Amino acid sequence: MTIMRKSHPLMKMVNHAFIDLPAPSNISGWWNFGSLLGLCLIIQIASGLFLAMHYTSDTLTAFSSVAHICRDVNYGWLIRYIHANGASLFFVCLYLHIGRGIYYGSYLYKETWNVGIILLFLTMATAFMGYVLPWGQMSFWGATVITNLLSAIPYIGTDLVEWIWGGFSVDKATLTRFFAFHFILPFIIAAAAMVHLLFLHETGSNNPLGIPSDSDKIPFHPYYTTKDLLGVMILLALFLTFVLFFPDLLGDPDNYSPANPLNTPPHIKPEWYFLFAYAILRSIPNKLGGVIALVLSILVLAMFPILHTANQRSMMFRPISQFLFWMLVSDLAILTWIGGQPVEPPFIMIGQIASILYFSIILILMPLAGLIENKMLKW
């Protein structure tokens, strides 16, 4: 008689994905971030559900309802800060997960990688709309500035913006629809994540050496369930430190002022995890050009499988590519810093140089490095 997890239709699926899944024996801690992202999504959906029970998506009461959650709801402050900082945690894990994929050549699993890019876009859209909901100053002006970018689209731009707004400015209709989309998108993300896993399990996981691991596989459980559990413990410890000791560290003080269409904040900027893209957007003086650069800053990830020139998959034994990878990480750190600075010298020039460097490293220097390394290894 076969054991239930191998015969029951539902448990069989779980078994193949998380228990008897053959996994490479040498995957490192960098492979923990997939499961950690799943945990982040669960935390966000759970905390978001409880917040939605008390939140009202009306311009007159939205700000007050968030204050009510923090003051009057049992542990409302905790749920609110878990949700707000959970978004930051989500993006930390997301960026580390993508960085891992670039470093070890995981992008050569094209289907998995492309679904991952779609997941990134969906997550960014969800986070943006969630930031609008508290209806503080930065919520309102952030929504106004970012949605207004669509007016740069030739011919249909203005109509498109007014259609998204549901009027002639960011108002009640905008807030209501953003709440509706913010509620539904995480479930779409969850479905897309399952597709992401489906494609991954078609090929099996990559490993740090970037070589086939079919000859040396181990079961996912207990080895990687235990390893993931360690990652979960570390992550939750760091997360709760933030939530309980520094809940407002990553937020904007302006968002503690109710939205006022008659008073523009001195520096309109998004949350820290969008600053690199915001810096790229601002580095181009032309509105349409900036919007295109903004979209391309994420879409450029789709070029990695196409521009992979090296005969080795992983960067583990490719020092020139390693140098360029860390240069890219440093460049993104500079862009993040610039995105939070006012538009004035010397920040304008630094932002423009960093933006050019960002695209140059990915589109020109990394493929060249791969070819040079092939020559050096006489491949």
From Swiss-Prot:
SUPFAM superfamilies named in the record: a domain/subunit of cytochrome bc1 complex (Ubiquinol-cytochrome c reductase), Transmembrane di-heme cytochromes
Membrane-crossing residue ranges in chain numbering: 33-53, 77-98, 113-133, 178-198, 226-246, 288-308, 320-340, 347-367
An example Gene Ontology CC term for this record: respiratory chain complex III
Alphabetical list of Pfam families matching this protein: Cytochrom_B_C, Cytochrome_B
Residue positions binding heme b b562: H83, H182
Record GO terms (molecular function): metal ion binding; ubiquinol-cytochrome-c reductase activity
GO biological-process terms attached to the record: mitochondrial electron transport, ubiquinol to cytochrome c
Compartments in which it is found: Mitochondrion inner membrane
Signal sequence segment: none
Domain of life: Eukaryota
Membrane topology, from the record: Multi-pass membrane protein
Iron found in the keyword field: yes
InterPro entries: Cyt_b/b6_C, Cyt_b/b6_C_sf, Cyt_b/b6_N, Cytb/b6-like_sf, Cytochrome_b, Cytochrome_b_C_euk/bac, Cytochrome_b_N_euk/bac, Di-haem_cyt_TM
PROSITE patterns: CYTB_CTER (PS51003), CYTB_NTER (PS51002)
Binding site for heme b b566: H97, H196
Residues involved in a ubiquinone binding: H201
Assembly notes: The cytochrome bc1 complex contains 11 subunits: 3 respiratory subunits (MT-CYB, CYC1 and UQCRFS1), 2 core proteins (UQCRC1 and UQCRC2) and 6 low-molecular weight proteins (UQCRH/QCR6, UQCRB/QCR7, UQCRQ/QCR8, UQCR10/QCR9, UQCR11/QCR10 and a cleavage product of UQCRFS1). This cytochrome bc1 complex then forms a dimer.
Extra information: Heme 1 (or BL or b562) is low-potential and absorbs at about 562 nm, and heme 2 (or BH or b566) is high-potential and absorbs at about 566 nm.
Family of this protein: Belongs to the cytochrome b family.
Purpose: Component of the ubiquinol-cytochrome c reductase complex (complex III or cytochrome b-c1 complex) that is part of the mitochondrial respiratory chain. The b-c1 complex mediates electron transfer from ubiquinol to cytochrome c. Contributes to the generation of a proton gradient across the mitochondrial membrane that is then used for ATP synthesis.
Protein name: Cytochrome b
Organism field: Chaetodipus hispidus
Taxonomic classification: Eukaryota, Metazoa, Chordata, Craniata, Vertebrata
Name of encoding gene: MT-CYB
